């Protein structure tokens, strides 16, 4: 077993980012050998109504289309609803309000070549308490090297919470 193989078998956490005013947070040094990426959210909220999304990128930049899948949302007071994830990224919810906070994780697994499968779960613990589930897929044009947290509109600012990425 080589040192590279041993390192690839270990979870490699990155430095967590405290969200105070950015419109996007980028993790840009994901190695080509990574087969699983976990994005962690703790109390993540924005100052607007654009849905937080995760975008994947390669050497050509972040890809802003071609994401497929669905988001399911349920609560104690309402039946489950299911909608398509935004085509611009993996959405963690369907609609949001300023200050709504989300805690959970998104797991990205390489299924083959540049094709990635996404599975996520979040709790929204402000306003109406909900559970949000995501299943999706994205095929990149080249090897994944970066992950971005932004919003579907791209202009709302994150105003609270912590975001981090690990890979293995």
Question: Model segments located where?
Answer:
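Surface-exposed molecular-recognition determinants
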Residues: 4-168
């Amino acid at each position: 077993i080589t040192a590279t193989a041993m390192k690839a078998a270990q979870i490699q956490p990155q430095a967590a980012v405290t969200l105070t005013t950015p419109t996007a947070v980028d993790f840009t040094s994901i190695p080509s050998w990574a087969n699983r990426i976990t994005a962690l959210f703790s109390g993540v909220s924005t100052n607007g109504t654009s849905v937080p999304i995760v975008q994947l990128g390669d050497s050509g930049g972040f890809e802003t289309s071609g994401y497929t899948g669905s988001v399911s949302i349920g609560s104690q007071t309402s039946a489950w609803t299911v909608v398509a994830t935004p085509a611009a990224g993996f959405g963690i919810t369907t609609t949001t309000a300023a200050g709504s906070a989300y805690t959970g994780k998104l797991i990205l697994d390489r299924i083959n070549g540049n094709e990635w499968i996404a599975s996520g779960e979040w709790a929204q613990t402000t306003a109406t308490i909900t559970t949000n589930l995501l299943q999706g897929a994205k095929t990149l044009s080249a090897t994944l090297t970066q992950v971005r947290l932004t919003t579907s509109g791209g202009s709302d600012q994150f105003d609270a919470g912590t975001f981090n990425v690990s890979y293995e």
